[in-house]
Amino acid sequence: MQHVAIIMDGNGRWAERRGLRRSAGHRRGLQTAREIVAALCAIRVPFVTLYVFSTENWKRSAHEVHFLMNLIRWYLKKEMSFYVEHAIRVVHLGCAQTLPPDVRSQIEYVVERTRSHRGTTVALAINYGGKDEILRAVKKVLCSTSCPDGELLTEEAFGACLDAPQLPSVDFLIRTGGQQRMSNFLLWQSAYAEFYFTDILWPDFRVEDMLRALDEYRLRTRTFGGLE
């Protein structure tokens, strides 16, 4: 297994069920993210992608969006020592240009600071949407002089125009929170991904739950459209 992607769903509902503000769920969700990433690093999963903030999340209340942007900036700064300790290389997925300047600067700092790390690569999908990524990749292709004839375009050439072309295809996509949909996440990269859905809300998702999911993945047979 090369690449595990996670849709970390259920932070707000976790808080609301406890009579707390949604912000409390988002804070607790960050702690869960650290625990899960540390565990995946320990078992040497080479690539992990976390769905942090989608292009659709801008539709939430201005108050919640403002809180999330501040939380993301704070989290990236706080986790720098964690990334160094585990030799994690951080890459960003999503449109950085439309993020608040302070958030964008913090992302750029963490990406540059961890560029030489040789441990697990953690891709943070912030202001990310699968359709948006594909559209931006198409625009790159159209502006490229290396492929003037669309008929010559290959999957490999197109993949090189995605946000993080070094990421391999997703092997296993985990979604917490009870919903069973992709929510515009890694549409190109998940063509042959195995999916795992759980009702557990993200803040309650423990390392044991993740290991149980990985055990189920190992029992599956992937044929990639062929025969067993």
From Swiss-Prot:
Q: Which cofactor does it need?
A: Mg(2+)
Q: Does the keyword Metal-binding apply?
A: yes
Entry-linked InterPro entries = UPP_synth-like, UPP_synth-like_CS, UPP_synth-like_sf
UniProt: substrate binding residues: 10-14, 22, 26, 54-56, 58, 60, 175, 181-183
Q: Where are the transmembrane segments?
A: none
Annotated cofactor note: Binds 2 magnesium ions per subunit.
What Pfam family is a match for this entry? Answer: Prenyltransf
Q: Name one GO biological process term.
A: polyprenol biosynthetic process
Q: Name one GO molecular function term.
A: ditrans,polycis-polyprenyl diphosphate synthase [(2E,6E)-farnesyl diphosphate specific] activity
SUPFAM superfamilies attached to this UniProt entry: Undecaprenyl diphosphate synthase
Query: Any idea which positions bind Mg(2+)?
Result: D9, E194
Asked if the keyword Magnesium belongs to this entry, the reply reads: yes
Report the domain of life of the source organism: Bacteria
Query: So where's the catalytic machinery, residue-wise?
Result: D9, N57
Principal EC category = transferase
For this UniProt record, the keywords arranged alphabetically read as follows: Magnesium, Metal-binding, Transferase
- So what EC number does this one have? 2.5.1.-
Relate the protein's function as given in its record.
Catalyzes the condensation of isopentenyl diphosphate (IPP) with allylic pyrophosphates generating different type of terpenoids.
* Quaternary structure note: Homodimer.
> Which family is this protein grouped under?
Belongs to the UPP synthase family.
Protein name, as recorded = Isoprenyl transferase
Source species of the chain: Treponema pallidum (strain Nichols)
